From Swiss-Prot:
Chain positions covered by the region annotation Hinge: 143-172
Lineage: Eukaryota, Metazoa, Chordata, Craniata, Vertebrata
Similarity comment: family membership: Belongs to the nuclear hormone receptor family. NR1 subfamily.
Location in or out of the cell: Nucleus
Protein name as catalogued: Retinoic acid receptor gamma-A
Amino acid sequence: MFDCMEALGMGPRQLYDVTNRGACMLRKASPFYAGLDPFAWTGTASVRSVETQSTSSEEMVPSSPSPPPPPRVYKPCFVCQDKSSGYHYGVSSCEGCKGFFRRSIQKNMVYTCHRDKNCQINKVTRNRCQYCRLQKCFEVGMSKEAVRNDRNKKKKDVKDEVIPPESYELSGELEELVNKVSKAHQETFPSLCQLGKYTTNSSSDHRIQLDLGLWDKFSELSTKCIIKIVEFAKRLPGFTTLTIADQITLLKSACLDILMLRICTRYTPEQDTMTFSDGLTLNRTQMHNAGFGPLTDLVFAFAGQLLPLEMDDTETGLLSAICLICGDRMDLEEPERVDRLQEPLLEALKIYARRRRPNKPHMFPRMLMKITDLRGISTKGAERAITLKMEIPGPMPPLIREMLENPEAFEDQSESTEKKPEPEPPAPPPPALLTMKKEQEDEDDSWATENGSEPSPEEEDDDDEDGEEERGTDSDGEAWGGQEPNADVSRKSHGGRAQ
C-alpha cells in the first residue's frame, strides 16, 4: 500500500492531509454539519475521532470562576500621608483625619498654634498642633458643607426610625380607665386657669417663724383639699373594692404626696408663687410663714422640676392614682391585690405619655421617678408637722393631724406637753377618711338605729353588749360601753371629753 503511495509521489502524511481537507469540505457543505462526521461512517481517521471526543469533553467541564477584582487602593491621606480609608468630605483621608475634621466642624472648635502657624503635619506629628492640622484639612480640600450634609442625613435617618404616634394606641379598657381617672382629677382639682387669683400682703417681705393668720387660712384650705383627695380616691375604678383597712392605709400614706403634687402643679415660675384651690396665691416667703417652714425650698424646687415634664391634667391624675394605689405601703392586708389594681394605671400612663410625646420616650420613667421625690417630701412633711404642733397656739386640725402626722410620734409629743386628767387606753384610729361626707358603713347605720343617735365621726364603733344601750342613751359613753370591766370609768372619761 505504501509502495503505491510512493509511486504516486505521496507519503502517508500527505495522504492524511488530502483526506482531512476533503472531510472538512464535506462537513461544511452538508446541512447536517453540526451532527455529522464522515469519519464516523468509514471508521478511518481514528486520530480525528479521538481529537473530537477530547474537544467535546473539555466543553462539558464548567469553567472556573473569575478571580475577584483587586482591592481598591486609595492615595495616601492628603493631610498626614497615613494609609487612606477612602474619600471623606471630598478628599482621600485616613480615619483619624476624617474624625478630627468632623468633630472640629460640628463643635465649632477654635484651636491655637503655639508656634508660627506653619507646623509640619504628618503621621507622627498630626496630634501635636490641632490648629495647623485643621488648616491643612482646608488646604487639601475638605469641605465644611459635606460635614453638615452628613449630619443632617443622620438626623433625618433618626427621625425616620421614630415609631409613628399611631402605634401608641390605648385599648378600649385602658381608654375608659384614662377617661375616668382624668374626670375624677379634674372634678376634684380645678386647673390654674379656672381659678380667680388673689393675693395677701400678710408677711410677704421677710420670713418669720409662723404667721398665725396665714396658718389659719392654710389649714382651712388644706382640710378642704384633703376632702377632695378622698373623693378623688373613691372615684378611682376598683379602689372601693379594697378592704376598708387598706383604703385607709393607702389614703393616709399617699395623701401628703398627692397634696404636694397638686399644689406644685399650680406653681408660677415667673412670680415664684403657688396658688391654692380658692385662688389664694402665696409667694415663697408667705409659704414659709404659713407653716411650711424649712420645707418651703424643697417644695419649690420640686415644683421647678415638674415644669420640663409639661404634664397635663390626665397625666397628673394618672400619676396621683399610681402614687395612691401602691402595693409597697406598710401594713396593707392585701398588697398583691393593690399591685394588680395599679398595673393598668401604669400601662395607661406609659401609652398616654408616649402617644402625647412620640419623640420623648424617656418622659414616662421620669414621671415615675417623681413619686420617689414626693415620698421624700412627705417624710419631711411629717417631721415638720410634729414641730408645727409646738408653734401653733391651738390644737392641730383633725384631718391634718390624721393625714400629715405619724400618730405614735404625735402622741409622744402631746403627752409631754399636756396633762391629762386620768390615763385611758388609746382608742383605735377613727375612720374619718371614709366618712368625710357623712357616708357611714353598715355598722354605723345599725348602731344609729339601735341607739337613736348618730355616732361621732371621730369615734369608731365598738361591739355593744346586752343592756348597754339602755343605760347609755343620754351620753356619748354608750359607744364605749361594754368593752372592759371599768366601763363606768370609760364612759365618764369619754362623756367628759365630748362635753
